[in-house]
């Protein structure tokens, strides 16, 4: 039996994660009081029903504070039953959560007449710390769309698209923070920066003028060759380990030019029938993720 406990901050996408798992054949329960996890699992095991082979349970700040404080013991007892337990935790920057609640006009579960939204978000972070500190699967949804989140959930829990490993190439800007959900981070800030050419500043690494600017640099050429060689050498090893996903992030200062160019160039070089290739440009406007499929 496999159990995925889905937790995270309100507004971070927990409902979407549970819906995705349900679509993938998981028996899903949202907002189950934490002390009921163990008796539910005992009953599921006793039933010997294949319907309970894969279970997903949503646990969040709607649980009583005492239940969340005792979560580590509850998790330990669940594992003593022989259940393969994983914790998937979704989070986002406070500013993003504030914006999402403002746009949807939904009520945060911890707000009331005396607790404003910003304070409720901070309180929730404190309440969920016992769950967050034990999570082994993390997704930061600050910059993700619903489509991207669904794919990330499938990656994290081991349901790759089409039965293949998902390889995600992601560009980002260091000034906006390093992605939390990545396996490799490469720093491209040492390369020539199109930002300092006035005519290129408003463009991105997808535009022909920026592509031409970077393509004629020997340093960019060498960087790309070495990065390609590294990934071509080690991707087969990850495939041999039956990994369901591999996330590679390339960053420059703002995530507009160099990192975008490198990700696009890598995608053209690495396309393979051995994995499902996804491209994501975190700092660019939508559409921000593309499936390059196989060839």
UniProtKB/Swiss-Prot annotation:
HAMAP family: RapZ_like (MF_00636). One of its GO terms (molecular function) is GTP binding. GTP binds at residues 60-63. It comes from the Bacteria. Displays ATPase and GTPase activities. PANTHER family: RNASE ADAPTER PROTEIN RAPZ. The keyword Acyltransferase does not apply. This is Nucleotide-binding protein MCA0739. InterPro entries: P-loop_NTPase (IPR027417), RapZ-like (IPR005337), RapZ-like_N (IPR053930), RapZ_C (IPR053931). Gene3D superfamilies: P-loop containing nucleotide triphosphate hydrolases. The keyword Cell membrane does not apply. Keywords: ATP-binding, GTP-binding, Nucleotide-binding. Pfam families: PapZ_C, RapZ-like_N. Belongs to the RapZ-like family. ATP binds at residues 8-15. NCBIfam families: PRK05416.1 (NF003828).
């Amino acid at each position: 039996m496999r159990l995925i406990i889905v937790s995270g901050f309100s507004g971070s996408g927990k409902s979407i994660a549970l819906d995705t798992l349900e679509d993938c054949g998981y028996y899903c329960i949202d907002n189950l009081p934490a002390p009921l996890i163990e008796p539910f699992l005992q009953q599921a095991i006793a039933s010997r029903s294949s319907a309970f082979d894969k279970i997903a349970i949503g646990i969040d700040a709607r649980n009583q504070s005492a239940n969340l404080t005792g979560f580590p013991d509850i998790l330990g007892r669940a594992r003593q039953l022989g259940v393969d337990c994983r914790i998937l935790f979704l989070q986002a920057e406070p500013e993003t959560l504030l914006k999402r609640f403002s746009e949807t006009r939904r009520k945060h579960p911890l707000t009331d007449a005396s607790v404003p939204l910003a304070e409720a978000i901070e309180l929730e972070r404190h309440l969920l710390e016992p769950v967050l500190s034990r999570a082994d699967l993390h997704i930061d949804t600050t910059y993700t769309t619903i489509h991207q989140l669904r794919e990330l959930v499938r990656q994290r829990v081991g349901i790759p698209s089409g039965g293949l490993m998902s390889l995600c190439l992601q560009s980002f800007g260091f000034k906006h923070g390093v992605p939390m959900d990545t396996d490799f981070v490469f720093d491209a800030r040492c390369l020539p920066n199109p930002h300092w050419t006035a005519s290129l500043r408003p463009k991105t690494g997808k535009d022909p003028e920026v592509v031409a600017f970077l393509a004629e640099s020997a340093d960019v050429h060498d960087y790309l060759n070495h990065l390609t060689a590294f990934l071509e050498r080690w991707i087969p090893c990850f495939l041999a380990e039956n990994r369901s996903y591999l996330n590679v992030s390339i960053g420059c200062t703002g995530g507009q030019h160099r990192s975008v160019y490198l990700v696009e160039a890598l995608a053209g070089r690495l396309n393979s029938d051995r994995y499902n290739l996804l491209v994501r440009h975190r700092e660019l406007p939508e559409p921000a993720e593309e499936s390059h499929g196989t060839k």
